[in-house]
């Protein structure tokens, strides 16, 4: 009998404890709060909407032939079908993401590809392990913000896109660049832009990881030039075109 009373007392104590700390629902409480409010209430307070999963996106990195450039792949489209180069902080006024990446100490240039972002550091002494956490956070925060990647469109350089005024040779050069050469260069985190053809010389602009790559001349001569000459006999050579700021930097580094 005593054991039964103790068991009953323990059961009553458990029920009271549950009502006190677990807030067991009763008909009285349902009148105050409908059942759907209990069902929809999350177990933990949410800091962001459930649909905002991009904050936890998985970003992959890929090495490039340039040891100072690293390719960041966010797993979603960046510019989809085109590329955009930001060689200096001044050029980043068109993109909120590029501006934020330049605020990271040690970042020299930024390049957007169809589905990747190439970041180039200032020198080989900088450790990627120190830069990558800030770059990861900047990319994730930007995609979570929903802001547009580019706020001001810029027209392509003259002669880059195909034109009805192009002669047969120029049209073949542009088609070969777009179908065979540029996709390969973009896999290495860069791009090559057509700037002109005169007296048998194709003038090209290297971007992204190719800009300061030690093997950029080999890429031009052994890769691009050989392919163009193989398919287009009128091509006698390839020449690299540099912007004024790139030429000044190259002269400063060589002096």
Curated annotation (Swiss-Prot):
GO molecular function: 4 iron, 4 sulfur cluster binding; iron ion binding
Annotated segments matching region NifU: 173-241
Keywords, ordered alphabetically: Cytoplasm, Iron, Iron-sulfur, Metal-binding, Mitochondrion, Transit peptide
Places the protein is found: Mitochondrion; Cytoplasm, Cytosol
Transit peptide, UniProt annotation: 1-29
Superkingdom of source: Eukaryota
GO CC field: cytosol; mitochondrion
Signal peptide extent: none
Matching SMART domains: Nfu_N
Alphabetized SUPFAM superfamilies for the sequence: Fe-S cluster assembly (FSCA) domain-like (SSF117916), Hypothetical protein SAV1430 (SSF110836)
GO BP terms: iron-sulfur cluster assembly
Family: Belongs to the NifU family.
Subunit structure: Monomer and homohexamer; the apo-NFU1 is a monomer, while the holo-NFU1 is a hexamer composed of a trimer of dimer that is probably linked by some 4Fe-4S cluster. Interacts with HIRA and EPM2A/laforin. Interacts with BOLA3. Interacts with HSPA9.
Function: Iron-sulfur cluster scaffold protein which can assemble [4Fe-4S] clusters and deliver them to target proteins.
Protein name: NFU1 iron-sulfur cluster scaffold homolog, mitochondrial
Organism: Mus musculus (Mouse)
Underlying gene: Nfu1
